[in-house]
Every structure is written in C-alpha cells, then in structure tokens.
Regions:
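Short, amphipathic alpha-helix enriched in basic
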Residues: 1-13
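Alpha-helical structural segments
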Residues: 2, 38-59, 70-74
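Amphipathic alpha-helical segments within well-ordered protein domains
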Residues: 29, 51-55, 130, 134
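Short, solvent-exposed positions on alpha-helices
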Residues: 41, 62, 66, 140-148
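Hydrophobic/aromatic-rich alpha-helical bundle segments in the mid-to-C-terminal region
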Residues: 115, 135-152
Length: 152
C-alpha cells in the first residue's frame, strides 16, 4: 500500500515490492497472479472495511432517516487510521482507491471478474445504502444510482 501510494499503480511492480520488503518477486506471485489482481484485492478490502463500519455504526439506529444520514456520513467522512486493523493504513488505502480504483474495472476482463465476484462487496455497499434510501422514501425510483453517486 505504501509503495503504490508513493510511486503510483502504473509504476508499481512486484519486483519493486520484492526489493522493498526483502523478498523475491516470484514469492509475491504466489499470492497475486498480477498487479491488477492485487488492486482488486485492495479494492475489495477497502469496501469490506467500509461495509463493516456501515453495519456496526448503523445497526442500532431504528429511525430510517437518521440511519441514512449516518450512512452518508460514514461513506463521505475523512478516512482516518483504524486501530482495529493495524496491518493496514486506511488513509493510504483510501488514496489508492480514489486515484487508482477505476483501473480495477476498466479492463477487458471486467465482465468475467464481475461474474467471479470481484466487485461483490462494492455492490453490497451500494445495495445497503440503496435500501436505506428506500426505507426513507419507498417510491424513489433511482435509489441504486443515488447510492452509487453518494459513495463515489
């Protein structure tokens, strides 16, 4: 995460990562088939972390409008380091998501990756917020679009 943040995803290679962490390049390929798959993993981790916050922080709110307002606050607030996950710097990960995540779905393989579930957590976050919107205003026809716009 630190290296991708420092040099950008386009300049990032497993060879550079291996040098940085004192490992050989081939050992990294055991975990990730390509740097694109690493970006997909980091993206999924970020959206799962955000979903975790949504669930934990809105679970006990019974008023639908208050729940939606809290959800919007959660997905739009400034990201700070989460001590529950000391192995990840969420502030740097957020910067990577903002700057590089479009590269995870602007590929020829996007449909196949979608079928394989790579974007499932992201879609779940959108669905959660969409459902909160519909709980406030059931007749609103574009809740998925609005939810997507809010998190982007």
């Amino acid at each position: 995460i630190i290296l991708i943040n420092d040099i950008g995803f386009d300049n990032f290679t497993f060879k550079k990562l291996g040098t940085k962490i004192g490992s050989n390049e081939s050992s990294i390929y055991r975990y990730f088939e390509s740097k694109h798959k690493l970006l997909l993993y980091l993206s999924s981790w970020y959206w799962a972390w955000l979903e975790y916050q949504l669930v934990i922080e809105t679970f006990s709110i019974s008023n639908h409008l208050e729940k939606l307002e809290k959800a919007v606050t959660i997905v739009t607030r400034t990201v700070v380091e989460d001590n529950n996950f000391a192995h990840i710097d969420e502030t740097l990960l957020y910067k990577i998501i903002v700057n590089e995540s479009s590269k995870s779905f602007l590929t020829k393989e996007v449909d196949k990756e979608n079928e394989e579930g790579y974007f499932e957590v992201y879609k779940r976050v959108i669905t959660r917020i969409s459902e909160m919107i519909l709980n406030v205003k059931k007749e609103y026809s574009f809740s998925l679009s609005l939810a997507s716009t809010i998190i982007e």
